[in-house]
Structure formats: structure tokens, C-alpha cells
């Protein structure tokens, strides 16, 4: 489909973007790869919820507990989500070993594929200009990269990809009804990943199919029947296997706690007002919002321009319903829930990138249609400056807030060969630190209070981690230190 933006150029700019789409897409995907994979092994494992998935996946890979996943060797009833994310991480561990990269590679790959899918679909739906600019924005969206998402082992990156695939499948199903059958595997994957969070894409599907209407004589029921079967069968297989293991001990809380309680009450202190998510959006993504405001200032939206901004949707009730439902479920559902956390906004980021990219595309179309070349240069500079600022923010966050070097985990990883098979003591082990020691390095975590407790409990050659400046004395010998901690060995 051609790129029909709010301003009509002579076709030269549109043709130029089309001609350079492949090169531009490669560059955008390269940027996304850098932002998602660079230093993936040099960032600290977080306590919530990355460490929970890490330990359960490592135990699954080691012990084969694929149906009833465990935590510290016992069936896990705290994490009430189905096991797809644990399965993916465990398969990565079995294939390539337990490392910080294999822990996160499934999420990082899912986020990278989200950028790819958004660009390929947006080119068909809205043209090359919108596609490339949307992909660029999404590749450098802080929340999409860091907030429980692409660079962590949590479920949110894959969930965002699956919601986007739901939108793409519904869009394609308008002209090719049998493509709706793909909704089955997508919805099944969402349930096996996030349980009752499947309601978000399910509400989207029902809204579009019921409200959006259909063409006269169109037969959807064979494809929708296939979709229903492909949704139910994988879910029923896993639910039956889990029920045979422990009855309703897991399945009951999966519904009651992870859906009813999370929706009706603010769990674990995660509260917020109706402005919680708008506030998070402006706090984390003010650079792209300011750049969008500059584009609107340079090329003001008259009534005619605003009407034609999304001309591809004009006169198409199905597409309009899909666009409205996509925006609605990704914004209204998290807002209505009583439990509010920043990463519930992750499925919204592809449509956020599409909206921002479309405004930039409109600006470039207007610039080509007018004689004000300086506005085009200002808009180009604004987009590039915004990208540079966001990239700087991402790298700064990686090197300062998430850097593993000055943590307990960094100390352990620097001495991984020394500590393999050894006992290491600490006052209290955090889950994330224990995962690194026991599953990445192959050591054994033990607890003792202070240097005195360590000396009493330890054997000759055991190790202890103490905060700076502790660790001096005849009973222990310094092995390595960073800014905050010391790794010491009991003196022979």
C-alpha cells in the first residue's frame, strides 16, 4: 500500500523511502540488535522477577520438571503463571549452557522480532515511511528495552510480540479469512505464558470480529473453528497434565490470585491513580514526546490534515475497529486494574511507536510538499537528536544502574573458575546472587553471620563475601574486591 500521509507530495519522497526501505530496515534492525543484545552478559540479574524465572528454569533444565516447575527444589506456588517462559529459558540453558545471555536471549529475540513484525506490517498497512520511523522509535524506546522487557528474562517482551501478532493476524484476516486460524496458536501461547492475561488479546479479537463487521458472503467460521481448536488443545493438554500432578493447588491460585486479586486489589503495594500510566509514559519517553510536539509545531495539524492523517482507515469500519480496540485494550485494561506496575504498559509500546512514527512521516510528507526546506532539516535534526539522546540514556543506564561489575554477582563472575564447586558464605543470599553462584558458576551458597560466624561454620578453603571495608583479619585472606564487597577465603 502506498504511503498516504496527511500532506501530499509529488511522489518523489515516497518513492525514495520505498527504494531505500530494505537498507533502512536493516539499519533499524541492527540498532535494535545493539540495544537488545549488547552487554547482555554484563548486566546484573534482578531480584524481581528475573531471578524467580532463572532459578526455576535452571532446575527444570537440570531435573526435567516440565509440568510442575520448582523453586529451590519444591513445587512453586508463588509464581502462578503457566510455564512457557520457564520452558523457553530452560531449553536455552540445555542447548547453550547456563549463562546470563542464555537466560535473556528468548526475551531479547522476542523484542527484536517485535520490531521486525511492526515494520513489515506497517509497510503494508501505512507505507515505508511510517514503517521505518515506527521501527526506529520502537528500537529506542526505553520501556520496551529495559522495563521488565527485552533485556530481562521476564514474560513481557514475548507477551508484547504476541499481542502485536494478534493485531497483524486480524488485519490480514480481513482479506484472507483463513489467516484467522493463526489466532489459535497465538492465543494458546499467550495463555501458556501469562495465564489469564490472555483476556487482553481475546477481548481485542472478539471486539474486532463482532463490531468490525464482515463482507457479504464472507465465511469465517471454518478458520475460527480451527483457531478455537488450536487454542484449546495445547491449553487443555497442559492443564490436564498439571491437574494430574497436584489437582487445583496451582490452577486455583492461577485464576484467583493472578487474575481476580490482581484486578480487584493492589497487590504487594503496587497502587496508582488513573494517571499512573500517562505519568510513566512521559517520565520514561519524554524525548520522543517532545520530538513529536516539535513535528506538530513545524507542521500544524489543520482539520483537513488531521482527517487525512490516517487515510488508510477512512471508510474501513473493520480497520477502524481494530485500531481503536488495539489502543483500548493496551491502555484501558492496565488502567482499570487495581494492581499497577510500569511493565503492564509494554504491549502499548508498538502502537506508541506507530503513532510517533506516523507523525514524523506526516512531517516529512508536508516538508516535501512545501517550499520550506528548513523545516525538513529541523525535523530531520529533531529525530536524530532524539535518537541520540535516547541512545545515550540507554547506554548510561546499562553502564551505571545495571552494570554487574560492582555487585556481588560481578565479584562471583570474576572468580568463576576459582569458585566452581566451592562453598561461599554470606550473611544473607539474594535469589539473584544465588542463581549466579549455584547455576551459572556451580558453587554452593551458605549463610553465616559476619566474619565470626563464617570462621565458626566454614571449612578450610571456603569463601565468604563481606561488605567493604570488612574482611581484614588473620582468619581470612582477601581474594578479590570491588567498590562494595570483598571476596575472601578462610586462611589455611
Task: Give the role of each language-model region.
Residues 34-38, 52-77, 84-87, 91:
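Extracytosolic helix-loop segments that constitute the early lumenal/periplasmic catalytic or substrate-binding loops
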Residues 338-369:
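Hydrophobic/aromatic-rich transmembrane helices and adjacent perimembrane loops
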Residues 105-126, 165:
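Transmembrane-helix motifs of polytopic, lipid-linked glycan transferases
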Residues 386-490:
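Short periplasmic/luminal acceptor-recognition loop of GT-C membrane glycosyltransferases, typified by
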Residues 53-59, 185, 189, 193, ...:
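Transmembrane-lumen/periplasm boundary regions of multi-pass, lipid-linked membrane glycan transferases
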Residues 21-28, 118-141:
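Transmembrane-helix signature of polytopic, membrane-embedded enzymes
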Residues 13-14, 124, 129, 163-182, ...:
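Membrane-interface transmembrane helices that cradle and orient dolichyl/undecaprenyl
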Residues 117, 158-175, 186, 352-355:
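Specific aromatic-rich, kink-prone transmembrane helix
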